UniProtKB/Swiss-Prot annotation:
This is Repair DNA polymerase X. Its cofactor is Mg(2+). GO terms for cellular component: virion component. The lineage of its organism: Viruses, Varidnaviria, Bamfordvirae, Nucleocytoviricota, Pokkesviricetes. Residues 42-51 are annotated as: Involved in ssDNA binding.
Amino acid sequence: MLTLIQGKKIVNYLRSRLAFEYNGQLIKILSKNIVAVGSLRREEKMLNDVDLLIIVPEKKCLKHVLPNIRIKGLSFSVKVCGERKCVLFIEWEKKTYQLDLFTALAEEKPYAIFHFTGPVSYLIRIRAALKKKNYKLNQYGLFKNQTLVPLKITTEKELIKELGFTYRIPKKRL
């Protein structure tokens, strides 16, 4: 367990130190492409882990980012890692914490932020209401009859309003 303040410190540290190796070169992940999600974004007082979403510009980049993740100046071990999710254990101030990294394409960003911010109970209610209208919402997009429904949105707030719900800041979601 770590406090919200510790979680924010870890995220601030990571924003300037996340990179991935590609063709023998270290590629820095820009701070603007790193989004805190999960209990940290909901500003819960105590956190089980730190969740970060990394926005990737192109689909072909997915296979390179997480499997080749590097953190400058921080000791870590990989528990499990794939193209879309990586679970790490990081050493921070003489303690070990879990860091969950997720990836999303730029066009998936609002959906992924909503999905990974949660909480699960809130997502279930939204998805149940959408299911009654034959829609499916996940971290990749909004679908009707298994076909992606293109929405002209760029933020999570726009997504919620487009779906016909009242936007609640993450801290107020139950």
